[in-house]
Amino acid sequence: MPDVILVLVFLLAGLLCVRAAAGRWPGLVGGTVEGGRRTGFACRVEPTVMPTDDGSVEVLAIQMCGRIQAPRNRYDTNVQVLIADVTEGTNHPQPVLCTDEAWQMEDSPAFCLVAHNGPIPRRVAVLANWVQVATIPCGVLVFPHRGVRRLQFVVSLHGRRDGRMIASASTLYSFTNPKPGYLDEREVQPSSPQPIEVLMLRLAAGVCQNDGVLPDAVVSLLRDWIVSQAEQAIAEGPERDAAVQYLEGRLDEALSLAQAGRLDVDGTADKLARQASIVDRYQAAGLVLQAVGAEQAVLRHRTDRLMRIAGRLGIDREKFRAMAQKCLPMHTHRVEDMCFLLGIEPKMDADERRQQLNQEYQKWNARVTHPDAAIRQQADRMLTLIAEARSRLADEPTVVQA
């Protein structure tokens, strides 16, 4: 039965971003050449060796070439590089993780490189020769499985101030991964009494229960999550129905344990930390935050518990907070909740709080003109929260979060 219900793992924010990139930019694989002159925007990957103090390392050189159309002359840009593992097909991309935090997505360990590219000199510019935009050491990349992997690299140019995408291209590249992948590590773990998905459900239920009771909105969200997981992994038919039935049964068990006061949240998080891959752990954290967000309220004891759970799962605090900003309600008026969402620590003095709020303001203000409507809406909500925090917290000598 565990073989039937184990579902395809998706890295909540990271994979969504990679899949969105693949969806927005289909068919932009390379460019075309007419009369020896390249038209369109293109990218490619070149393997090479880079010397180091200790010898050398294998790297992947990412290059771009071709036509770039900007809104105006001297339009300042950033370059972004994303990588997806499409060995199972472009309709089933899996995230490529990165061990270097500088090249990770804001809210997950999935690879994402963003660097300043500089101004585009004219509205229409053509790179006649290949230009290198990044060199990625192979050793920092973590793939789903060992062996030959088919990778999709997506290179895009975005406005530095407004986030507008002005050029994009993708290319496919085969890479042989000699090390176990993050899903291989999951498969070789000792057999668990419950599959990873059961532990995820127990963790979310345990965090959200109040005196043994889970709000109906949370239970509904968890049941929808079960169906979604099965639909992503299993073709329609008896096996999918069996997987849904199995996981719903385990959720009912978790609800009974919560009612009896016997649902061990910390112990469940520790089991996930031991048995689950990093992808599973981020997915578990994302499910917990979605469940808490479904309540439309974040209570003080729960924010403490959330940070403790993140620590037990081995998730970076700042990445967890970025995930929380996407999932948790923004209409809070509690000082404790504002501090949690905006990264204000009790030990900060007034100057440090103002600096933290300024950093958050700069980050979100840069997104108010983003081409993605969902990001614009989130930016508006965050800026409203920051304004309230400034009026209530910035000049206080201390902030008591209790």
Q: Model-found features: residue ranges?
A:
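Small-residue-enriched hydrophobic alpha-helices in membranes
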Residues: 2-209, 213-402
